[in-house]
Amino acid sequence: MAGRTVLTLYAVHAARPEADGGRGGKSGGAMDTSRPDDHDRDTDEDAEAPGTAHPATGASRRSWRNRSPALRGTGGAALTADRAGRWRDLQEVSLDLSQRKLRKERLVAIDRRDAHLSGSFDMLRTRLITALKANGWRRVAITSPTAGCGKTFCAINLAISLSRLQAVRTVLLDLDLRAPGIAGALGLQPTAPMSDLLTGARDMHAHLVRIGGNLALGLNDTPIPDSAETLQAPQTARALKAMQFDLRPDVVLYELPPALGHDDLFAFLPQIDAVLLIADGTHTTAEDISACERILSDRTPLLGVVLNKADDPDSRRHAKRGS
């Protein structure tokens, strides 16, 4: 298997027991087999409205699924149509699907000629969805201990794999404000710097773009020096809550800078439910992973550790891009 990226989810964080004695500590919930528009039946009863204080991550919380019969009538239908329309109103863009581009950027979840590798992302997708469903989570940070572990590669291919699930809407935001890479890897031009979206200077619908029916992207190609300060600013929290409230995605993936050496991940913990850690099989050490676990401590669950590039000679190319 020389020269092949090996993707292995070798550690899955068990769910914490519910404070009310509800779900146990297993993360083996069934896949969501609802119809494509079922998630649009959610209503404001359980949603986080912009400006609403969020409970500590990992704590017991209600599902966003509507439980109020009173809200299943005309008002709920209007909300459903409105939010579905907001998703569809996002500018739709197309990817360069030439074999040269797919090979260069290793968009294996699109190419799918490498059945082993694309299948690995599908397996990761299924485990992710199962864990999120079991715990009532939606917001996942994707990071790595250090640069060069392939977190951008993993974030993009995981998002694309998720987008093939008809009943799941996914948003992928490039919040590695130190070294953004998603736009370049996909060959797309951001409409504006991510900082404009986070500070409220630019409307969400003017910034996010949509690929197909189920994947929305928040792109960036402009690094900013005060990355951690921006991520923990109140206006950032408000902007992200507004995005979730308006679009009601089923999964939100945030790519963040490497966890060690910067405080971006720590600063952003209040905005996420769980963390997916990308480790490099060629240089990530057990101490690196332990250091990341100490950052998370009891604040945010570690959803899993993905061992990437176990025997991939291209890791240096990814390291140069800070991904």
Where are these regions (language model features)?
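Active-site signature of alpha/beta-hydrolase-fold catalytic machinery across serine-
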Residues: 157, 161
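Phosphate-binding P-loop
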Residues: 131-137
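Hydrophobic positions on the alpha1 helix immediately C-terminal to the Walker A/P-loop
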Residues: 154
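P-loop/Walker-type NTP enzyme "switch/lid" segment
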Residues: 95-122, 126, 133, 146-149, ...
